[in-house]
């Protein structure tokens, strides 16, 4: 800090945005990860700062919001609260959702609950679906209409959309987990290499979640590539997974779990949010384009996305 004090930052909210500021401040290229450990030493140094928050664009920690320690000679209360960073000069990926594909793929579909077995296993439906299955009744009506014909029994109303996620960075996007930790999904017959590759949410004007979104685990592969790039990663068998530079992974609106369950949502105006790499497990060049945020208009029968823009997740 400006007063020249030597000590440590203690925080249980230390993250990649704070690490980005530190790496910039010490003249390094980019942040690879933020650490909370005394593995690198400094356990016995005085606590100088705590409860720090940065947005990642500051030039130094002094520009962030923080609280100074009110006493001298006090160390971090726990070794796991000692903040550290790992900087890198390596190339990094940069994920970005395709706004056009998202807007133009939006549609509503009603499906009987008995046809959503795999989706229920992967927790892709709102909690009322599991109650409906348990009691054998529809949470909002005794019957519904699909394609002009009555469909009796529990049904769900699904807001479907496509996710086209491009890698515009300088390195391939690879899952953090080693392949030995990948999860086999018997319903879809492939491995998921990331437990939460994207989040889907519907929010009200106050930022409160009004429809139960979900964390979508994914099998990552190259589906589309710009010339002269070629596909490298595949979901077949136990192949390497990832998204190559200049390529995109595409999850079409007709694929299981490419939806938000809006069975319990009342008509109105909302905010739709799709966020990729939401837990920042994989370092990127830029996090300010990871989310697609749109205005959602829903009248109970149809829905429309408008004014979509890229933002930080």
Labelled PLM ranges:
Residues 1-91:
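Typically disulfide-stabilized, N-glycosylated extracellular/lumenal ectodomains of secreted
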Residues 91-313:
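Extracellular/luminal regions of secreted and cell-surface proteins that mediate adhesion/ECM remodeling
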